[in-house]
């Protein structure tokens, strides 16, 4: 389906817009998130968040380049998830004691 028709579905508030977006760009968005996160579940969550944010933001906005708009949102959510996962307090490292410290 063409981007203009998908965007028109969003403006009509048709839930079919999300289905058409997923059918057209779902694999590309998943691959984009997967390259950033290297985790299937987190990638699926980023794509779902992308669809939700698209549903919330498109009626006032009409993006000229629909895939670029979706990719920007997906990248934003994936990088946010990556930052959250790699936060210093959540990342534990095991360090072995040296001989001097064992005494």
Residue ranges and their predicted role:
Residues 2-6:
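Acidic, Ser/Thr- and Pro/Gly-rich low-complexity regulatory segments
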Residues 11-12, 38, 48-66, 84-85:
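Sigma70-family region 2
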Residues 21, 25, 29, 50, ...:
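Residue-level preference for hydrophobic side chains embedded in well-ordered alpha helices
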Residues 72-94:
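Arg/Lys-rich amphipathic alpha helix in sigma70-family domain 2
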Residues 90-92, 99-103:
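Acidic, proline/glycine-rich intrinsically disordered inter-domain spacer in sigma factors
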